[in-house]
Amino acid sequence: MAKKLVRFDWAMKRILRHKANFDILEGFLSELLGEEVTIKQILDSESNKETEDDKHNRVDILVENSKDELVIIELQNSNEYDYFHRMLFGTSKAITEHIKEGHPYAEVKKVISITIAYFDLGQGKDYVYHGTTTFKGLHKNDVLTLSGKQVELYKKDNIYEVYPEYWIIKVSQFHNRVKDKLDEWIYFFKNAEIKNNFSAKGLKEVNERLDEIKLNEKDAKEYKRYLKNLRDIASEQHTKMADAQDLIKKGEEKKEIEAVVGLYENGVPIPIIAKSLKITEEMVIQLVESQINK
């Protein structure tokens, strides 16, 4: 049986910000981005400014890697309809806050935004999405590229490397079918466990350091409280969804009653009403009588 590990979002808040645990985040980023990633430092992020209402709902961490790129890793537990706008705001904020006043635009840092979403963000069949910026010709359909001088100055080969890059991992869309090493990480995000045959970078360290039974008494209590808050959020969302469905059902029932009574008052025979609305004749009689006896 796989050991019980702490959730990645809680680990991001409490454990992964320490330099001794950078190798865990480095492992995840290396598997996602397909290159070796070294973390230089953890920078201040929005998590430190969150309110009591949303601190259990969202966790984010801002990383600077050895290539001087900024990497925003954000984990979101529940739905926000304007979340795509939030992603844009986050990358824009990171750019403006990390360029010194009076310095040239060429010093604008590349930003990589990674969202680990535990809700159905947008509409799509996949569970990992990657977004970049390209410029395509309106008439020739060619892709705009950097000049030789720009490649030399920016140390980049393509225009999209200058602009923010977005990754979205839809954990709720992942069906536990592991096909590669990135899937091993997503399996951990969803299930808080690691299978014995997993070999993705960083997961060995996760297995060693994020073991739930290794938490000290204070952290164990806080972690239990954190899980309870997540359950409360999930329960509240379930209740809202059920209430919405009830309202829809009541609206449909009201329309059905109005249709039955309207047809009856216009002299349409009960058998024809029943056949037209695909209900029984007894139901038609009950609905008509319920309105007459009001």
PLM ranges: what are they?
Residues 1-220, 225:
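Conserved single-residue anchors adjacent to enzymatic active/cofactor-binding motifs
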Residues 71-76, 180-294:
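Short, charged alpha-helical interaction segments and adjacent helix-coil junctions
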